[in-house]
Amino acid sequence: SIKAGTCMIAPSESVAEIVNRMNNGCHDSKTITFYPGGTLESSKYKASQSSSGVDKTSVRYILRQAGYSDDEISNAFKAKYDSPLFADRPSGSSLEGYVFGETYQFTGDATVKDVLQTVFDHMYKVVQKNDLVNKFKAQGLTLYQGLTIASIVERELGCEDKPTVERKNRCYQYQRGIAQVFIARYKKNMQLGSDVTFIYAADKAGVKPKVDIDSPYNTRKHTGLPPTPIATPGELSLKAVADPAPGDNLFFIAGDDGLIYFAKTDEEHKNNIDKYCQKLCSIV
């Protein structure tokens, strides 16, 4: 029988899970929200520059706010988890990219490992729902490679927080175009050339971002993919890599007007920079 009480329902829960919780009563619960584009750790460089440099979207920060200690969090980051999600995850790699952005509900006695296991189970449902393993394979990518490219797309352009369906869909079409560029460059053994990867490398090292930072994560300096994802991709960026835009573009820029401009050749790309990217492109 259903017990009286207040239950907070997470979007990721199935009907059976909801009914089971209502039958057992809901109490001592906690709500934890993770974010698309979030990373496991806050930027060491930003944190060293000011007391307000902590990234409030980082997984560690969010888990701290939920009442867990740094030791509990660190141990959970190193723990082993049972999920088909990790079938092709390289041995020894971190959990970067797997803490799927969503709002989750937990009992008060849930451990950090319980929290992360629930998150991974939910992410695998997203993988299954969108048939990502097969769709990535059709692009010549493993699940881990697709996840890694999607994380770069996410940091280049996040779409999950767009306020209207129309704006979110327009943003998603840009994500598909960006995914097409990165996949094409990867297949041609070209450097991906993504600025967000050297920024991630600098954040991990605790140094000021520089385009020539010597790190395997810096795709402006090294060919191939970074060793791991650089953030948690949202569902839209995952779908963008699974179904990239048609075409053979090899370049893109974010213009000063907020639009994305694509090009097939270096000459076209330089023309786009001259026309549309005087401010933003001078920063790097």
Language model segments and positions:
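Short, structural beta-strand-to-alpha-helix junction motif
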Residues: 14-15, 39-40, 111
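Bacterial extracytoplasmic/cell-wall-associated proteins, especially those involved in peptidoglycan
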Residues: 45, 49-53, 57, 62-284
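Terminal hydrophobic membrane-targeting helix
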Residues: 1-31
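Primarily a LysM-type cell-wall glycan-binding module
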Residues: 30-50
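Flexible glycine-/small-residue-rich
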Residues: 11, 36, 108
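Short acidic, gly/pro-rich beta-turn/loop elements at beta-sheet edges
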Residues: 17-19, 42, 114
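Acidic helix-start/capping segments at beta-turn-to-alpha-helix junctions
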Residues: 1-2, 36-41, 78-79
